[in-house]
Amino acid sequence: MHTVIRSATKEVLLGHDQKFCIIGERINPTGRRIFQEQLRAGDLSAIERDVAAQVAGGAMILDINMGVPLTDEPDLLGRAITLVQSITDLPICIDSSVVEALEVGLAAYQGRALVNSITAEDDRMAAILPLVKKYDAAVIALPNDHDEIPMEPEKRLALVDKIVRVATTEYGIPLADIVIDPLAMPIGADPQVGRSFFETVYAIRQRYGINMTCGAGNNSFGMPGRDELGASFLPMAIASGLTSAIMEARSPRMVSAVKAADVVMGNDEWGMAWIGDYRSKMAAVKAAAEALATQ
């Protein structure tokens, strides 16, 4: 089963038989005080640098979040999307908790977006799924509701059942366009959340075969050595059935771990992408050494 996300000129497929999809997380003001101040002043120049760094790192889709307090988020998100699609052909994941901002972003986008996100809450689905249908988008869905963020895989799976039923039968969203986020949680707060996540991913794949994503950094939040933890977490999640992640595309360690997992899972045929990347790295090392020798 494939989820199709595309820009005006480029298409990306999410699927269990496809390379793992790296969704760049960087265009997000959360925890970035200077970036927030720039956005409040109407300065979007940092976005251009974020795009360039993530493209160079290997991002395949770019998540865009403009959730800055004391700003007009719909206007800011629309401007950011217009800017990003003017400088890269990578597809976009439109990330907002504000329904009005999502609609402005979807209207501004020249492609088929991934919407981030809905939950199993009835009011959230009622507000956003009509937009997903109207703009022929795909949507990320989280199995939590007003009552709780469940820890048990069985409870999460029950909420996935609800989301799938409501989205497909009440709003006509194709199953392939529902991308479940099984809820990666901080291992520093509870040592069992990693195991629970992998079990949830596996159960969702067995029941529905649909695509899944997560905020990969959530797993290592509050811990030292976050790149190392992410580089262990992601291949294990991929083996369980995860097909994409909103992640730090500027981390060579995590990106390499994902690409290695593609080889091991049989989604990089004959390891050709891995070999090509390795040769490029060796050529860069050789060029740097030769340049140093001539100084």
Where do the language-model regions lie?
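Domain-level signal for soluble alpha/beta catalytic cores
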Residues: 1-179, 185-295
